């Protein structure tokens, strides 16, 4: 519970004294999922992560540009189909290059390691003189 509260305190729009969120609706858009990185924060709400962004406000509320505690809302990046397409494209595009890329990285690591060893050797020789 302490971790949950700590996460909420770091979240923009959270008031630690009242324990309520006030989130501008513009944050709940298809392009801004990065703001909502931990869905555990929203367990108190009626709905959290689903494919569309919905808002419901109280009838008494005059300003409906803010989400308030207890309002139903959801955050969306992409639909499940779009997400699957993105993942498959990523793997298809990297499929042919993956092993070459890893070999290049490992050879670069070996080069830096060798140069580091040489430097250390030079320092030791200077100290011995």
Swiss-Prot record:
Residues 84-98 have a biased composition (Basic residues). It comes from Acanthamoeba polyphaga mimivirus. This is Uncharacterized protein R547. Residues 84-129 are annotated as: Disordered. Residues 99-115 have a biased composition (Basic and acidic residues).
